[in-house]
A protein has these predicted regions:
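Periplasmic OmpA-like peptidoglycan-binding domain that tethers envelope proteins to the cell wall
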Residues: 97-205
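Conserved phosphate/oxyanion-binding catalytic-loop motifs
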Residues: 94
Length: 205
C-alpha cells in the first residue's frame, strides 16, 4: 500500500492496522513529528497466520497439585492479552494439561482448575469472558514437541510424543524434565467472528 503526501500530514501520528482473513490483526504507529521536509517512509511487515493447532503458552508453571497462577508467570500472558485486544473478533480455548501421575479423575479436575485460573486472570485484565473457554485435558493429550529440548546433555528431539511409555524409557533425571514439558497451558483459536457485546444491536439480543 502507498499513501501520498495529500493523505499524510506533518506533525501527526497515525495508527496503521493491517487486516487479512485468517491472519492476526497487526497494528503499528507511524509519526511525522519533527519532519522538516517531505520524505518517503518505507515499512515492511510480516503478519502471522492464525494457527489451527494449539499454541503452548511459555513459562506458565504450577506448584505440584496446585492451580493458582503464580505472579511471576503473569508476564507470560502479556502477549496473549495484547493479541486479544487487537483482535476483538477472536475467541479462544485455554487448555491445560497435566503429567500422567495421580489418577485420571484428579488430573481432569486439576487441569480444569488450572485452565480456569488463566481465564480468570485474563478477565481481570479486561478480556470479555464470553471470548474465553477453559478446558482441562488431564493427561489425555501428551505433548508432541515441535523443536528439540535439551536437559543437560540429553536431547529430546522435535517430533517426539511425550507418552507415558516414552517418559518411562528415559534416564531417571530426564523423566522429571519430560513430565514438566507435558504440564502446560495452551491457547487455540476457536472462532474468528465474535461480535463484541457493545456492538450488538437491540434487535440482535
Amino acid at each position: 500500500f502507498m499513501f501520498t503526501n495529500s493523505q499524510i500530514k506533518a506533525d501527526e501520528t497515525y495508527i496503521l492496522t493491517i487486516n487479512k482473513k485468517n491472519y492476526f490483526v497487526f497494528t503499528d504507529t507511524i509519526s511525522t513529528a519533527g519532519f522538516e521536509t517531505s520524505q518517503d517512509i518505507t515499512k515492511e511487515y510480516q503478519i502471522n497466520t492464525i494457527p489451527d493447532n494449539p499454541v503452548v503458552l511459555p513459562d506458565i508453571l504450577y506448584d505440584l497439585a496446585k492451580w493458582e497462577l503464580q505472579p511471576q508467570f503473569e508476564d507470560s500472558l502479556r502477549g496473549l492479552i495484547e493479541m486479544l485486544q487487537v483482535n476483538p473478533n477472536i475467541t479462544i480455548e485455554l487448555g491445560s494439561h497435566t503429567d500422567n501421575r495421580d489418577s485420571h479423575e484428579s488430573n481432569d479436575i486439576l487441569s480444569q482448575k488450572r485452565a480456569q485460573s488463566v481465564c480468570d486472570y485474563l478477565v481481570i485484565r479486561g478480556i470479555d469472558p464470553y471470548r474465553l473457554k477453559a478446558k482441562g485435558y488431564g493427561e489425555r493429550v501428551p505433548r508432541t514437541l515441535h523443536k528439540d529440548y535439551r536437559y543437560k546433555d540429553y536431547v529430546i528431539t522435535a517430533g517426539t510424543e511425550l507418552t507415558e511409555d516414552y517418559i518411562n524409557s528415559l534416564p531417571k533425571e530426564v523423566q522429571e524434565y519430560a513430565h514438566q514439558l507435558n504440564r502446560r497451558t495452551e491457547f487455540k483459536v476457536i472462532s474468528k467472528d465474535y461480535v463484541p457485546r457493545e456492538n450488538i444491536s437491540d434487535d440482535q439480543m
